[in-house]
Amino acid sequence: MLKLTDITWLYHHLPMRFSLTVERGEQVAILGPSGAGKSTLLNLIAGFLTPASGSLTIDSVDHTTTPPSRRPVSMLFQENNLFSHLTVAQNIGLGLNPGLKLNAAQQEKMHAIARQMGIDNLMARLPGELSGGQRQRVALARCLVREQPILLLDEPFSALDPALRQEMLTLVSTSCQQQKMTLLMVSHSVEDAARIATRSVVVADGRIAWQGKTDELLSGKASASALLGITG
């Protein structure tokens, strides 16, 4: 479904190079030390960075140089990127039509996603009137309403308290299963990864150092466990 073949990004003339295959509907965690290249990997998939070499295909279609706006990918960051002067409904609606001219079917889709996120009673509010968790629900709704086959998460819930973070992770996992979306999530927490991703990828020094079952990492038996400070 998603295939990266020697995708290379030159960082201060030091190449970061990734090869990775992810199947449709998989939920994969991307782990590793700070500065290892996790966010770079996601930005290459999303199209925010243009690789120096290599190829990237989605459903066997070459998207190596496709601009972000035309790539079949949605991405959610720690900074939710909501527009402060637009209502919740308008922020979500941007995912359907940048001009916010929604037809009846699009209006219904927007409200259905809002109900799924538990924010249907907040549609007339501005982002500044919401809690941090509510703002991330709005940002997630905007991603989901686009119905792209791939969802990328770059630690969007790291600023939330532990209980709320787990609630959001469960919501993401369930939503991806319902929409049959492929999920790649950058995280610093193996415990968070284990909640929604049976498979993990460990990035170190701009390379994929290990990939396999998340449970193996948690047990401390995987070769990459030590990179994450886990001992058996």
From Swiss-Prot:
PROSITE patterns: ABC_TRANSPORTER_1, ABC_TRANSPORTER_2, THIQ. Residues 2-230 form the ABC transporter domain. Its EC number is 7.6.2.15. It comes from the Bacteria. It is found in: Cell inner membrane. The keyword Nucleus does not apply. Its main location: membrane. InterPro entries: AAA+_ATPase, ABC_SmlMolc_Importer, ABC_transporter-like_ATP-bd, ABC_transporter-like_CS, P-loop_NTPase, Thiamine_ABC_ThiQ. Disulfide bonds: none annotated. It catalyses: thiamine(out) + ATP + H2O = thiamine(in) + ADP + phosphate + H(+). One of its GO terms (molecular function) is ATP binding. Gene3D superfamilies: P-loop containing nucleotide triphosphate hydrolases. GO terms for cellular component: plasma membrane. It is a peripheral membrane protein. Keywords: ATP-binding, Cell inner membrane, Cell membrane, Membrane, Nucleotide-binding, Translocase, Transport. Coiled coil: none annotated. ATP binds at G32, P33, S34, G35, A36, G37, K38, S39. PANTHER family: SPERMIDINE/PUTRESCINE IMPORT ATP-BINDING PROTEIN POTA (PTHR42781), THIAMINE IMPORT ATP-BINDING PROTEIN THIQ (PTHR42781:SF1). Part of the ABC transporter complex ThiBPQ involved in thiamine import. Responsible for energy coupling to the transport system. NCBIfam families: PRK10771.1, thiQ. The complex is composed of two ATP-binding proteins (ThiQ), two transmembrane proteins (ThiP) and a solute-binding protein (ThiB). Belongs to the ABC transporter superfamily. Thiamine importer (TC 3.A.1.19.1) family. This is Thiamine import ATP-binding protein ThiQ. It comes from Shigella sonnei (strain Ss046).
